[in-house]
Amino acid sequence: MSIKSQEGHMRQLALLLTSDLGCIFGERESGPNGSKKAFLNVGKVFLRALAKDLGLHEVTVSANSGGIAVSGTCSLYGMWEDRGIAVWIEQRLCADGKVLCYRPIRSSRDFKGGYNHFLTSSDLKTWSYPQLLETLSALRKDGCRYERAA
């Protein structure tokens, strides 16, 4: 996927994640005007292309819609040669603006991983796609040690 289309997905995700995706209106679990469903679909497309651009293998991309009061989560688990990365995109319950979480992992079955790192919806709005790739690729470099969170 092109840099321009991935930047478009970043902007679209930032916009969706600044609106209320959790909708407590009975049968309308897709949020107002289907925004929750749009978030989950765009999130999966974005993460699949991100995995390819990061050069990951053993990739798992998934979406969990959650319940009616939450945004749902899009996730990516992928491996380089000796280490990997886990990425989640979600609307957190506390309104701190953190929408993308990433951390190093040792295997595709490592659900504890290292320390969490966060990006905000503002970062997704303003950063270029190459800047995002560079930030996430830093976990691949030898200088980034894997440490288990307490």
Describe each PLM feature range.
Residues 1-11, 141-150:
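Short intrinsically disordered terminal tails
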Residues 40, 47, 133-147:
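Charged, low-complexity intrinsically disordered regions
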